[in-house]
Amino acid sequence: MGRKASEIIDLLTEDHDRLLVLFAAFERLRQGGSEDALQTLVEIACTEIVVHMQVEEEHLYAALADAMNDLFLLEQAEVEHAMVRRLVAEMETMQAGDRLYNATFTVLANCLTAHIEHEQTRLFPLMEGLDLPFDSLTQDLRMHRHELRSEFGMPDTDPDDEDEGSYRYHVARRPHYRHH
């Protein structure tokens, strides 16, 4: 794969990996953590999801739409994002301990996990052969992600500072974490 395409893919895969770590942490907390810890983790995960999807849609998907002949895979990814957004909106109306809270987040995690697999195995490999402005696209993705993470009070993570892929968050719970 071209170096330029791989830079974008690495950036987005870092987000995907962060989400998968959060989903695994949710499963552990669901089986024995406090409701407060569960609520905080879900809020963090939903914020991560919203930031990632917005950056991806506004930059990568827009560039892919201009460069791809067959838009079916991209359209499928957009529909998956819409489904995930609906589930995030549903989570925003709930509190840990509510009926269906754990089930709703589990469905959200499952939908997003399938979407991640779809992107990484079908959509990302197509990028290599496309005529995309990789340098500016990578810069735009990084900058917009940083801006959104700052806006939501989320620390930017530096993979070199982390221990073997574990992500640490130092975010105070926000009672109004709506992303709309």
Regions flagged by a language model, labelled:
Residues 1-180:
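Small-residue-biased structural context
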